[in-house]
Amino acid sequence: MNALETQGLGMIPMVIEQSGRGERSYDIYSRLLKERVIFLVGPVNDQTANLVVAQLLFLESENPDKDISFYINSPGGSVSAGMAIFDTMNFIKPDVSTLCTGMAASMGAFLLAAGAKGKRFALPNSKVMIHQPLGGMQGQATEIEIHAREILKTREQLNKILAERTGQPLEKIQRDTERDYFLSADESREYGLVDQVIHRRS
């Protein structure tokens, strides 16, 4: 996330640092990136996925042995964009610790659960929502049928990964994701989407 991409969030604060070579200013997100903190705020789409993937790869090149913190407040969005982030999280060497602030819904919840085991967190008043992938298609009947088959395959793929990440039986995941399934922070921990609800930084 850079200053151009976050203009919709309002004014971007700047941080000024003093050094022996003078002053240097950063937008707040660039400063936090130096501390290995990445944000996903808003919809998951090709643009946000591109930024997250680039930051993950950059931080791996900076230090492949140090954890990356990934803060999520997202209503979800594109499955293919989300899977690009998911695959990169698994591809890189550093552990990616996830933390839900506000709401992690749909693909946002999927990415929250994708964090390194034991390093997935939620703040106490955050919410999580899981459901099956959504799709819409217009065109000839044959094209609609092809897309329907593809979305069913995608649903099966996502459910299998969620079952693996949460420890829940696949049948329960299939049942729960039939409709929007909302969980509080504590319920998310019990479900296995996160490992811990944190009230205060230790």
Swiss-Prot record:
First-tier enzyme category under EC: hydrolase
Record localization: Cytoplasm
Gene3D superfamilies (UniProt xref): 2-enoyl-CoA Hydratase, Chain A, domain 1
Entry-linked CDD domains: S14_ClpP_2
Signal peptide: none
GO molecular function: ATP-dependent peptidase activity; ATPase binding; serine-type endopeptidase activity
Record's GO cellular component terms: cytoplasm; endopeptidase Clp complex
Assigned keywords, A-Z: Cytoplasm, Hydrolase, Protease, Serine protease
Catalytic activity: Hydrolysis of proteins to small peptides in the presence of ATP and magnesium. alpha-casein is the usual test substrate. In the absence of ATP, only oligopeptides shorter than five residues are hydrolyzed (such as succinyl-Leu-Tyr-|-NHMec, and Leu-Tyr-Leu-|-Tyr-Trp, in which cleavage of the -Tyr-|-Leu- and -Tyr-|-Trp bonds also occurs)
BP term (GO), one: protein quality control for misfolded or incompletely synthesized proteins
Enzyme Commission number(s): 3.4.21.92
Main subcellular localisation: cytoplasm
Pfam family of the protein (one): CLP_protease
Entry-linked InterPro entries: ClpP, ClpP/crotonase-like_dom_sf, ClpP/TepA, ClpP_His_AS
Active site: S106, H131
Functional description taken from the UniProt entry: Cleaves peptides in various proteins in a process that requires ATP hydrolysis. Has a chymotrypsin-like activity. Plays a major role in the degradation of misfolded proteins.
Similarity section: Belongs to the peptidase S14 family.
Quaternary structure annotation from Swiss-Prot or TrEMBL: Fourteen ClpP subunits assemble into 2 heptameric rings which stack back to back to give a disk-like structure with a central cavity, resembling the structure of eukaryotic proteasomes.
UniProt-recorded name of the protein: ATP-dependent Clp protease proteolytic subunit
Encoding gene per record: clpP
